[in-house]
Amino acid sequence: ILNEVFITHNDSGGEPSLYFFNLDGEIINSKKLEEESFWEIYNNDWEDITADEDYIYIADTGNNFGNRGNLNIIKVKTNDFSIEGKINFTYKDQEEFFYWIPKTKHKYDAEALFLIEDKIAILSKDRSNLFTDLYLIDKESNSKQVLESKITYDVNSLITGGDYNEELSLLALVSYNSKGSQYLILFENFKLENLAEKKFKKIKIPIERAQIEAIKIIDNKTFWITSEDEGIGNPYMYKLKVK
């Protein structure tokens, strides 16, 4: 959310564009990210989006088959939506890229992106064991970064989106399992200094035939969540309240 307007994007494919919509779900504007001479911007597999006062950060981090060597986060200026740059990264312990035989059960896919303190954080979507690994990225560095897992959480599901509220010290994630059940996962008192506290709440979301991919914290009991159109239902935005 930027200036009371929701900002979203397509998943993989299509134009590298941002879409702006209101509370009624009406698209009120769109902005194609210009391909500048130095930065080639593509929607390889955009998965999540977050922002601070100066920049929007777009996670081009989708890696279903573990064969991407061009994972990156795109930095977009909030004042004019011009491209500031890209933060390229790779995973330290990934030795195989499965170019010839795509592999679906691996931990080098990531769909959740959020800001915490002065870092960008991403959480893996691990089909091999249904855990999630937390990685931290220096948002000021322009050099390629090699990421190493800071901690692993046994969420027993596949993480598809995340948001962090620093005032509430609350991390909110959405996920699903192989049966199609959707979950809200809440880490309270979540800070970089206490990542080892692995306590979280996992709440089943009573929505069927939807692929929930994004979440925004309103307060510690209320959240916006959105689903995408993947052939199993229409895209929707829901306001979710928990007790």
What does each of the following model-derived ranges do?
Residues 1-243:
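Sequence/structural signature of beta-propeller domains
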